Amino acid sequence: RVIDSKGCRDIGKLTEVEKSLDRERGIFVIRNKLRNSAGRRKLGVLWLVLDPVAMSLVYLFVLTVVRSYPGIESLFIGISMFRILQASFMTGVNSIQDFTGGLISERVRSRVLVSAALRYRVLETTFQSSAISVILLFGLGVNLRAVLAFIILSQIMGILAEGVGLNMSKLVRRIPDLSNLIRYFMLLMFFGSPALYPMATTTGLHYKINEYNPFSYFVESVRYLADLESVIFNL
């Protein structure tokens, strides 16, 4: 086994026993991540499902009070997709703080950790998008094509965001103060991105900046397929 700055790996072919152990380790890592997400909360993993719904309802109330109501479908799509983006990115940033994957007795192969991280990202994103998908389809009458696009694009966006965060994780581990700057940046990005409102409502420099914002392409695509106000073909 070789452990260096590039990761933890073995030279040569793995035996069937080692492959079986890697699969079991991967499953353990995923379960450990779910336990960490649940914490000591009684609803546990269910909060992954409820969080996007709760946040959407909070901002729906706030925007209704200030008379800046963008449409409930557009708001639910925007906020839930940004929550997925944010969670995925921050998971990637914090991903290499622990090379054991929760297995204290040894360091797990990097391949196992990456595979487990990918599967967990798909699982968590499925949890996060499930309740919103049901609300969009059955509660708000959004067409099935748009709901499927919402689920698929959320998965793709989540994987890409975690990958970007993973690439930044070594730098953040070396300079811990960057984690605070990243949190401020994500907060700024939340209010600056077309999450609370369609991009069509932005003008000037605000619109121009969002043309270079990857999130805009994902969320505006879903809004277009949902027959909502969208500028996807102008980007």
Question: Language-model features: where?
Answer:
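Hydrophobic transmembrane alpha-helices and immediately adjacent juxtamembrane helices
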Residues: R1-L235
